[in-house]
Amino acid sequence: MKKNLFLMIAVLAASPVMGQDAKQIADSLSIPPVKAGAKQLPMPSVSGAQIKLLGADYEQLVNSKGKIAPVISDTPVNVSFKVTKDGKEAVSKDYEIMLQAPQAAQGNPKPRIIPEILQWKGGQGEYKLGNTVTIACPDKELGKLFAADMEDVLGKKVKLVAPGAKADISLSLLKGGNLGREGYRLQIARDGVRLGAAAPTGLFWGTRTLLQMLRQTPGSVPCGTAVDFPRYQLRGFMLDVARTPYPLSYLKDVIRTMAWYKMNDLHLVINNNYIFHEHYVDNGHDPFKESYAAFRLESKMKGKDGTPLTARDLFYTKKEFADLVSYARKYGVNIVPEFDTPGHALSFTRLRPDLIYKGPMNHEKRRCEMLDAANPETIDLVSKVFDEYMLKDPKLGRPVFADCGVVHVGADEFYGDKEDYRHFANAVLTHALKRGYTPRIWGSLSAKPGKTPVVSKGVQMNLWSTGWMKAWEAVNQGYDVINTNDGALYIVPFAGYYRMDRNHKGLYNNWIPNRIGNETLPSGHPQLLGGTFAVWNDETDIMHTGYAPYDIWGIISGSMDVLSQKLWGTAKAPDTFEQHRELVSSIGNAPRTNPLHKWKDSQPLTVKPSSLPQKLDKPALGPNYRLTMELELTAAPEGKEQVLLAAPEGELLAVMKDGTVGFRRDDSLEFSFGAKLPVGKKVKVEIVGEPEKTSLLLDGEPAGTAVLKNFSDKSKDFSDKFKHRPKVHRSTFILPLKELGSSFQGKVFHMNVQPL
């Protein structure tokens, strides 16, 4: 009896956590409720364990010391903790706390925008804008940009007035507070609109909120106060511009659309190559000579045989790229350029064939694209290429990457020795740090463990594959991480794999930025920067179907609005996916963008030229359309192109170099209808433009559907047994209408363009 009594007393006296380890305690904490108006986070307490705050997903509301900022509406925040017991540490799961606002009278409901406003205190009534809208802004450049966007949204005249002067909309920079670099405070009253922020970026994001509100209720906005800032500091999109070319005009539309949704990180893959070299090897061809590769920036680098590093089809001059980076900064978007080495580096190995990797490796048939990672000459070559853009350019007077801040060193999918890889990765990361840039790298160290140290302090890492890099390993090694998980966030357009674009609803309903593959980090972990979705153009070269940047616009923009909500907004989405998509439609495209090249009306264009060439100066027209011409080709010298219609968007060619009718797009891809115009005979020419298909009719009879020419000679040389040859051809063409007949040898009697 005494023995049983002793056991009972011991059980009652013992703490229930006495037998728990640090991890068990971390995931079973009891978090005290946060009272309204509390200024400090109440900490959980467990006997025998030390508990520290790790972080909060809204660090603007609960900082690293647990200080709580006031809120104007009830706001959920996730917090996590670090627990130490018996010399061992563990990180807790997320715990949601609710920060309560003082009770207020019911006012206007929260305006619906993308991403959702974090805090809103509704007022009564609305502010109405007159026929002329006045804006006062302390930043002249921002003021001009905002005014131009406002005119586009409202169709009204917008006038800039001096900072501090009476205006419909007054912008100001605030001192102190907890808004951070990207936060803003928007106050709408019956006497005007006031937008304040601690930094110009926050002001700019606030203008996007106002513009989205005005898109839905032109001329008025509801009274109330909004306080808004992002949940994650990095909200990104990666675009592979290497394996499929993209014109600068398209990238500017991407930037403006990112800004529309408050996305702020544009990662551009500058070099890459066709990765399925085995398709060449297995058919008796040499991929080193034949696989498609591109480096999209102007460079002075050349091989001993004169082979240029720069792509021959489409590239950006140093000035164009530097200007693009500066342009993006005006829209709150940081451009991160990537040079991918030592793998995916065919542009580099063609420059220096002697630096092809010689060690044992997996995927032997892909050796041609692998640089000799441990060779000092390889590291010297890659460093020199980076320096061409990271150091001051004599013509520009500044580095090409001056406004980038972050540069990406690539380093994914190297199939050689792990120590060689680690040596190379450490060298290129250290070089970027030495030049004053923050380097970013593809996570690969879980697949490449070893003794050679790889620098982590001040380094960002894309976590793209749990097989190559595990999230907790990356964090524990000291890297700042970005969720770029391939299974959730990768898109290879029109492929049978990596199709995040087919799962937008699932992404919207279920994806969380802190879940990376099968691992989950606390949402407020200080090393979790945010997330990025990626468009990879794997199906290039002999697998290219001819798809245009136009064809993937819906893929990009339709992913952006979803990721925006998930990365800026709270963990719980405010609407159903169907309601979200309705809102996307209501707010429309970003101001001053027309990515699908639609005309505002369906009125036809009719031209009867008296002579050629003739200026048309009409906007280019995207599908659907029908072009009808009556013309006569009077001469067709062999090998000489004849341009019928031209604009920055492309050229319609009456005669290509092979004599056929075709076109060249602004992405540099060329297409042929396979038919020739008769010489010395009047003919009726019709071009019918549809999404993914452009057709030719001559005198009312079908004369061909456009087919990609760029890689056609290669694909013909492969046997019909080559199962990867494209079975579908896409030939979207934006009809250029700036000039008619710039080099056409003949007469155009009549032209009609009809939007369909």
From Swiss-Prot:
The keyword Hydrolase applies. InterPro entries: Beta_hexosaminidase_sua/sub (IPR025705), GH20_Enzymes (IPR052764), Glyco_hydro_20_cat (IPR015883), Glycoside_hydrolase_SF (IPR017853), Hex-like_dom2 (IPR029018), HEX_bac_N (IPR015882). The keyword Signal applies. Residues 603-613 have a biased composition (Polar residues). Keywords: Carbohydrate metabolism, Glycosidase, Hydrolase, Polysaccharide degradation, Signal. Inhibited by Mn(2+) and Ca(2+) ions. Maintains 17% and 60% of its enzymatic activity with Mn(2+) and Ca(2+), respectively. No significant change in activity by the addition of Na(+), K(+) and Mg(2+) ions. Its EC number is 3.2.1.52. Changing E413A: No significant change in KM value, but 210-fold decrease in kcat/KM value compared to that of wild-type. Substrate binds at R243, D412, E413, W464, Y490, W536, N537, D538. Stable enzymatic activity between pH 7.0 and pH 9.0. Significant decrease in activity with pH lower than 7 and pH greater than 9.0. GO terms for molecular function: beta-N-acetylhexosaminidase activity. Residues 1-19 form the signal peptide. The active site is at N272, H344, E413. GO terms for biological process: polysaccharide catabolic process. Residues 588-614 are annotated as: Disordered. Highest enzymatic activity at temperatures between 30 and 40 degrees Celsius. Activity is decreased greatly above 45 or below 25 degrees Celsius. It catalyses: Hydrolysis of terminal non-reducing N-acetyl-D-hexosamine residues in N-acetyl-beta-D-hexosaminides. Belongs to the glycosyl hydrolase 20 family. Potentially capable of cleaving the specific glycoside linkages in the process of mucin degradation in human intestinal tract. Hydrolyzes synthetic substrate pNP-beta-GlcNAc with high activity and pNP-beta-GalNAc to a lot lesser extent. Does not hydrolyze pNP-alpha-GalNAc. This is Beta-hexosaminidase Amuc_2136. It comes from Akkermansia muciniphila (strain ATCC BAA-835 / DSM 22959 / JCM 33894 / BCRC 81048 / CCUG 64013 / CIP 107961 / Muc). The lineage of its organism: Bacteria, Pseudomonadati, Verrucomicrobiota, Verrucomicrobiia, Verrucomicrobiales.
